[in-house]
Structure formats: C-alpha cells, structure tokens
C-alpha cells in the first residue's frame, strides 16, 4: 500500500493559500479518479484509490501543518505502510512559482510540516514532491504563506497540475522514483 500526504491547514480561511498546495493537489487528483472516502478517527480526510491492484491512501491531515506528523504516523502504523511507499506533497518557498522538484529523501528545509513528519517518523527517508510557491522578501513568511494568493500566482503555482497528477499516478503504479526524478526535475 502507498500513502500520499497532501500538506495544508484545515479551515476555509486557508483554502487558497500557498501553504495549502498539498490539499489542492490531492483534490485535483481525486477529481480525476474514482475513490472511496474512508471514515476514521485519525484527524485526517482519508481517501482510497485502487489502480490495477495498487492500493493507495491519499490524506489531508486536519491538524495544523506543524502537527502533520502525528497523523502520518497513525496512518502508517494502522495500515503498515513502509516509509519508502510514502510521498509527501509540499509547498517550497525556495522554488519559483509552479516549479516542481521530486526528492527521494532529505531534511525539512525550514518547512514545519516536513519537520514534524521527520520528527514523528524518526526518518528523512520518505519521498517528496515539492511545488514552488516562491518567496516575497517584503512580507513576513507566515503572512506570505497563509494569505490567499491572487489569480496570477494561483495560475503560476498550478501551471503544472496535469504533470503533478501524472507524477502521482506513476508513483502509485510503482514507476521507479529515480526515473521520475530524472524525467521531471530537469524539465519542470
């Protein structure tokens, strides 16, 4: 079983913010595929997809970003998901708007959601799909990430949504992650 974690913050006031790109991606992928909503007491919206016997859970943690690791740990323990079968979708201020970067593993890069997942899982060995949201040096970081984006930025950030959905599909289908990194990191 695979686990795809879209990072974000719960609540309407965070809907169209840069920090909620993980939620947006999960919603986009689900809108194009048949899925089942699972009812569980885990502080997350949990969806299950089955492609050619490749079972996958997609989750949107409903804790705040900084506590995402709590939910991820509960899910992987309950479903016995291996660390190498986890893909976390996350915003990245160090990438230009809409730029994509796949990583096999790594640190948190200052991202508190990733930091909490690393702390709770006691490993950095999970895969990531980073989506660039850029950085505004004139605005405090928390305000920048948690303020709704304008239409132009939204379009830039999501310009590769079809490619993102293809990456997720390939991850679910067990395409070698090195091949995905080589194919997408240099082009998008």
From Swiss-Prot:
Positions bearing the site annotation: Stabilizes the basic form of H active site to accept a proton: 91
Positions marked as site (Discriminates between blocked and unblocked aminoacyl-tRNA): 9
EC number: 3.1.1.29
Pfam families assigned: Pept_tRNA_hydro
CC annotations in GO: cytoplasm
GO MF annotations in UniProt: peptidyl-tRNA hydrolase activity; tRNA binding
EC top class, as a word: hydrolase
Binding site for tRNA: 14, 64, 66, 112
Localization terms from the record: Cytoplasm
Active site residues per record: 19 (proton acceptor)
GO BP annotation list: protein quality control for misfolded or incompletely synthesized proteins; rescue of stalled ribosome
InterPro entries linked: Pept_tRNA_hydro, Pept_tRNA_hydro_CS, Pept_tRNA_hydro_sf
Catalytic reactions of this protein: an N-acyl-L-alpha-aminoacyl-tRNA + H2O = an N-acyl-L-amino acid + a tRNA + H(+)
CDD domains referenced in this protein's UniProt entry, alphabetically: PTH
Keyword field: Cytoplasm, Hydrolase, RNA-binding, tRNA-binding
Superkingdom as given in the UniProt entry: Bacteria
Family of the protein in this entry: Belongs to the PTH family.
Its biological purpose: Hydrolyzes ribosome-free peptidyl-tRNAs (with 1 or more amino acids incorporated), which drop off the ribosome during protein synthesis, or as a result of ribosome stalling.
Subunit note: Monomer.
Protein name, UniProt field: Peptidyl-tRNA hydrolase
Gene: pth
